[in-house]
Structures are given as structure tokens and as C-alpha cells.
Amino acid sequence: MVPYLTMEKYGRIDSVLIHVGGPPKGDLLDIPEEDWDKANDMVLKPVIRMAKLVTPIMEKQGGGSIVNITTFSAFEPSLTFPTSSVYRVGVSSFTKLYSDRYGPANIRMNCLLPGFTDSLDLPQKFADMSSLKRLARAEEQAKVAAFLLSDDSSYMTGQSLRVDGGVTRHM
């Protein structure tokens, strides 16, 4: 496991970034139950599993920061991505619960909700959804993640920060 290898090599874990792949898609009621289970296994369970692994370590060392990368549409579900919409809002809920429970141990957990990013091969219509009329650059998202993981955000926890170029400005 990565946490154990990290502890062996560095002796501590100060921050963890959790980013999972895209779960199965389909028409809302046509998605097989197995795909709903797969989506849960891909999106929500890795966050819970990693938290279980690193929390005791972070408690012993006096704190840490965990960032979950989800999606800008976590709170505005999309019929295009139904399983993602359902389970990523679950990640945000888990993040809030975790923050309440482990904040006193100086362990922070936040979510980064990125918009459409240039690392994906997307048509212009997705860029046009942004107030800025462009896709986010991957390094822009990375800088926000680095901020959330750093001590510069030491008073932020339980938050879901949208970095979507204004796509959700009306929601």
C-alpha cells in the first residue's frame, strides 16, 4: 500500500490527493445495478479507504490535509454523468463529516471541483460553457490543489471549492 511505502521512505504523510477515474455512464434507469456498484467502488469507496489508512498516521503526527478531486457538477447533477453525479456528491458529504470528526486532530479534508480541463480532448462547446470561454489549464487546477494541501489553507476544511471558470455561476 502506498501509505506504508511512503511512511517507510519519508517517515510521515502530510498531505494526500485523491483523484479517481470516471465511472460508467448511461441513461439513468438503464444503468445496470452492477455499474452503480462499480461507480461506488470507483468514486466513493477509495476516499473512505484512503482516509482509513492515513488518518491514524496523521493523528499521530499532529495533523495533515486530504484533498478529494471530484467535479464541478457534484452539486448540480448531470444526466450525461448520472453515476458520477450521485457518488461525487457523496464524496462531498463524506468530506464534511470527516472534517467535523477529525478537525479537532488538525486533519483537514476538502474537495476540489474542477471544470472542464484542457487535458481532456473536448469539443469547443465545453469551453463555451465557461464565462472565460476556454477550458481550464491542468496547471491551474494543480495550483488550487497545492493550495488546499498546503498550510496556506490551514483554516479551510469541509469545503468543496469550484474551479470551473464560471460554468456553475448560475446554479
Language model regions located:
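Active-site loop of short-chain dehydrogenase/reductase
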Residues: 12-14, 58-70, 104-107, 159
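A short, exposed helix-loop element centered on a Lys and neighboring polar residues
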Residues: 51-52, 96
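Catalytic loop of short-chain dehydrogenase/reductase
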Residues: 67-90, 95-104, 116
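Short C-terminal tail/terminal secondary-structure segment
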Residues: 76, 146, 157-171
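A conserved structural motif in NAD(P)-dependent oxidoreductases
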Residues: 130-141, 152
